[in-house]
């Protein structure tokens, strides 16, 4: 992906983070007093182009400022020129996007979701109820009508459906950080170049103009050798 997805002209990019864990959840890790950086919560940052559905960049790390900057630097390498970018309300994006993409003249906004407090009757696995969203322009002149993270959030669901290790209640979670990273790399490459998107009826790579055919699994494996 790094060889083929770079300096692309894009129009609208959406970014989000997907939670997972390696070995054990962060709360369990804290209870055991472990300081092993290769276990615990693992966040996958994803940037998707709204129209081609191409995954432009991804990053596996913690939900920290350092990893957010590492992710936005990858997005900067994958793109060129001005475009609109929308993220969720994670505060680290405000500096990271401007630092990595400000020179390209991007129009940056955040979609901040507002949640209601969980009633006592709900279980520990029940998601908080979203009661609304707030569109917050951060940099440049983003079009309010285009401020959305719907497409990347739909893609997050596809990720969870495609990889059992990312489902919330599972015994198939990753046991090693390297294995999760390798699985994500394979998934994103397959998604971009091999998997026909149901809406587009071609692969995202074909729609984005970086491939002229649907890749077979064999071709994908040869390209990574």
Model regions and ranges:
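Residue-level recognition of single "structural anchor" positions
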Residues: 1-225
């Amino acid at each position: 992906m790094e060889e083929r997805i770079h300096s692309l002209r894009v129009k609208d990019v959406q970014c989000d983070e997907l939670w997972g864990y390696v070995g054990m959840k962060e709360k369990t890790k804290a209870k055991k007093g472990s300081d092993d950086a290769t276990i615990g919560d693992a966040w996958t940052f994803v940037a998707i182009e709204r129209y081609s559905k191409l995954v432009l960049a991804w990053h596996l790390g913690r939900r920290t400022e350092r990893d957010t900057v590492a992710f936005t630097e990858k997005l900067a390498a994958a793109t060129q020129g001005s475009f609109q970018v929308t993220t969720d309300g994670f505060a680290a994006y405000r500096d990271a996007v401007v630092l990595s993409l400000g020179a390209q003249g991007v129009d940056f906004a955040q979609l901040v979701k507002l949640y209601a407090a969980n009633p006592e009757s709900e279980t520990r696995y029940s998601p908080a109820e979203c009661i609304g969203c707030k569109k917050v322009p951060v940099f440049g002149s983003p079009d309010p009508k285009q401020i959305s993270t719907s497409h990347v959030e739909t893609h997050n669901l596809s990720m969870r459906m495609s990889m059992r290790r990312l489902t919330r209640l599972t015994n198939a979670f990753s046991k090693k950080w390297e294995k999760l990273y390798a699985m994500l790399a394979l998934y994103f490459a397959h998604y971009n170049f091999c998997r026909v998107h149901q809406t587009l009826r071609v692969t995202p790579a074909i729609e984005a103009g970086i491939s002229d055919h649907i890749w077979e699994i064999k071709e994908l494996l040869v390209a990574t050798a």
